[in-house]
Amino acid sequence: MSTAVRYYSRSGNTKKVAEYIAETAGVDAVSVDSNNAELSDKVDVLFIGGALYAYGIDENLKQYLKTLSGDKVGKAVVFSTSWLSKHALDLIKDALTNKGIKVESDTLYFKSKAVDGCRDEAVKFAKKYI
């Protein structure tokens, strides 16, 4: 099963969770603003994460989500970190659904300050989909 991990992080919290997931999947976690973020081949599972900034997701993540399509992504699994709320999960899920991409209903969320102790939970979550 092919897997990819993409994320956007300003503070490093979402990046840390992405790296835990990627390590479990045996792939690299790639920031959506990197030159190599584009999916060149179809993936069975795309883990995609971001956080809430001023009640929305970052513009880099918004633009990346617009590039995705159902012919490149079998299903998406969403994760987020935020000190404020889980609303980024819904925003990301909605953007993916609007692109015709199947999105798992189960998500992964950590409050920003709890990220340091989240490795085991992130690994357990990732293993459900790989």
Regions found by a protein language model. Give the residues of each.
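FMN-binding flavodoxin-like domain, especially the glycine-rich phosphate-binding loop
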Residues: 3-4, 9-32, 40-130
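Acidic, amphipathic alpha-helical patches
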Residues: 36
